[in-house]
């Protein structure tokens, strides 16, 4: 019953990217939220065993790439397999943000973040990031919305 209600919650769809030296990875996420305006803080919830979890914790940087409503396939590309086994960036254009985190130039928008704090929340960690830079790349598009189990 509770899982059914949980699936009724609607979220945006994001690709959270990070970099640790030469290792780059990204994962699809829906549990992203604004936290504060002063300073500008955003959080993402990531399961403890995830490869991105390890890289963010070690590097202290990450970016949130906001997908648009035509990019469901991009969300699936970053959502189904672990970066431990697959290079999710193979063949994709990407740039580097001020922090060094990968940015997907085809995304609707991005936020470049420096890890400020980490909070254990059950089987996930909440990574609290301070915004270093943010930009809407394609304002003519609309953000992609996640329902039920589209990408996970």
Report the location of each language-model feature.
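Basic, polyanion-binding surface patches
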Residues: 1-152
């Amino acid at each position: 019953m509770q899982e059914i209600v949980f699936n009724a919650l609607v979220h945006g769809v994001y690709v959270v990217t990070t970099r640790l030296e030469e290792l780059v990875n990204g994962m699809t996420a829906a549990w992203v939220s604004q936290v504060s305006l002063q300073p500008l803080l955003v959080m993402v919830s990531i399961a403890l065993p995830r490869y991105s979890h390890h890289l963010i914790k070690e590097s202290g940087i990450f970016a949130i790439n906001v997908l648009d409503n035509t990019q469901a396939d991009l969300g699936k590309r970053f959502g189904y397999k672990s970066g431990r086994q697959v290079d999710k960036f193979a063949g994709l254009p990407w740039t580097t943000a001020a922090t060094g985190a990968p940015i997907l130039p085809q995304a609707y928008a991005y936020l470049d973040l420096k890890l400020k704090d980490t909070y254990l929340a059950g089987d996930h960690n909440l990574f609290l990031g301070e915004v270093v830079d943010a930009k809407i790349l394609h304002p003519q598009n609309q953000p992609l919305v996640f329902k039920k189990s589209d990408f996970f």
